[in-house]
Amino acid sequence: GTADVDLVIVHNQPVDEIREIIGMTPEVTLDIHHIEQSYYSPPRKVRKDPWIGSSLCFDPLLLYNKGHWFEFMQASVEAGFFSPEYVIHRSGLFSNEARLLFTELENQRNLGSSIYISSYLKIIEDGCNAVACLSGLPLTDRTLMKRFNEVAEAINREDLAPILYGLIL
């Protein structure tokens, strides 16, 4: 199997490097996100972010906390994270991106097969994450195929998983 370890480090000062990806073994990847503390204010902005908001709301493991900042921020973000307007907003971010990339896809056909295929797969990923955000958190590219069936079941659309597999195969 494979595993992703996501580590979010919140800094109280500007950061130079936003993201580091370190291959620990061929099967394990350490994905480190460096985020400035100011990004989390106001909390309603974080509720709209499918990646950062989800990192607070789906049982994160806290390694270090100074002054109860994390608990306060987590409670503030979770307070409205699952309200319909935020769920639809997060899903819409992925849906709109997939739609935009799809309209540009025909123009990329002449750029070469690797660019075209990469764009095609990104459209599928964004479409799947639009669905995933309706019931929970977005899926990483490494877990998308494995977990999409449960995402589709969560919104009572079991028919979506075979469609996804058909688009890939």
Residue positions per predicted region:
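Metal-dependent nucleotidyltransferase catalytic core
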Residues: G1-F58
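Conserved nucleotidyltransferase catalytic core and NTase-mimicking acidic/glycine-rich helix/loop elements
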Residues: Y86-L169
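Generic alpha-helix signal with a bias toward terminal, lower-confidence helices
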Residues: E17, I21-I22, I35-Q37, P42-R47, ...
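Internal, well-ordered alpha/beta segment that forms a basic, Gly-enriched binding/recognition surface
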Residues: Q37-E104
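Short secondary-structure boundary segments
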Residues: G1-I9, L63-P84, I123, C133-S135, ...
